């Protein structure tokens, strides 16, 4: 048995280059101890993106220089898997406000998109900003929370203490859903999969039609 490759995975949504630099040092130690010449070194992914305003954007310039040095020193091919970093901020989920419900200390904006369409907020308590499609200068009275229609306590998206005035039938967009959006979606609660539209410059094309109930039940 001959080992030709080594693969590492150190985490996800990493916003500092330091863990990646440490990984290279660990790999060097492994190569020195085992004296194995790996033809392929898969450094994985994990490169984070800025979901929140205060998220630090990762700087990979110094890391890339170390990778180039590592590649030359050990004469190997380098593989990366930067999925989120490529597609994370390339997509939005456009959804409609179905109802407004007044709570004791906040207003609920119930959307027609739920955790079945976008799971990250329910699964990881992830933060995804919601942007009004049409902006106005009016302010909502008190806190506003965007939630979904699924009968689960985790079917919620984000709460704002200050937000513009929202009305029933308004459209809003959930941001940065390109990674782990469609791939984590499901038919939970007998909900059809939503349509997907790709926009290239001024042209839009449907790449997945909205699923109908008949095809859902015939699965």
Positions of PLM-derived features:
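Active-site loop/helix belt of alpha/beta enzymes
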Residues: 1-100, 189
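Charged (often Lys/Glu-rich) extended helix/loop segments that serve as interaction or gating elements
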Residues: 66, 75-219
């Amino acid at each position: 048995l001959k080992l030709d490759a080594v693969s590492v995975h150190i985490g996800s949504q990493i916003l500092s280059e330091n863990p990646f630099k440490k990984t290279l040092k660990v790999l060097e130690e492994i190569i020195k101890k085992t004296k194995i010449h790996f033809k392929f070194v898969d450094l994985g992914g994990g490169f984070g993106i800025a979901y929140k305003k205060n998220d630090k954007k990762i700087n990979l310039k110094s890391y890339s220089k170390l990778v180039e040095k590592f590649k030359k020193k050990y004469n190997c091919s380098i593989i990366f898997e930067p999925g989120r970093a490529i597609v994370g901020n390339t997509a939005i989920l456009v959804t409609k406000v179905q109802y407004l419900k007044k709570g004791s200390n906040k207003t609920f904006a119930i959307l027609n998109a739920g955790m079945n369409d976008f799971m990250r907020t329910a699964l990881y308590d992830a933060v995804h900003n919601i942007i009004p499609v049409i902006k106005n200068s009016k302010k909502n009275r008190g806190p506003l929370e965007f939630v979904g229609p699924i009968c689960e306590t985790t079917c919620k998206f984000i709460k704002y203490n200050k937000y513009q005035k929202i009305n029933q039938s308004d459209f809003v967009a959930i941001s940065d859903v390109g990674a782990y959006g469609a791939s984590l979606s499901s038919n939970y609660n007998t909900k059809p999969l939503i349509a997907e539209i790709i926009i290239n410059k001024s042209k839009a094309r449907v790449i997945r039609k909205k699923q109908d109930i008949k095809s859902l039940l015939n699965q």
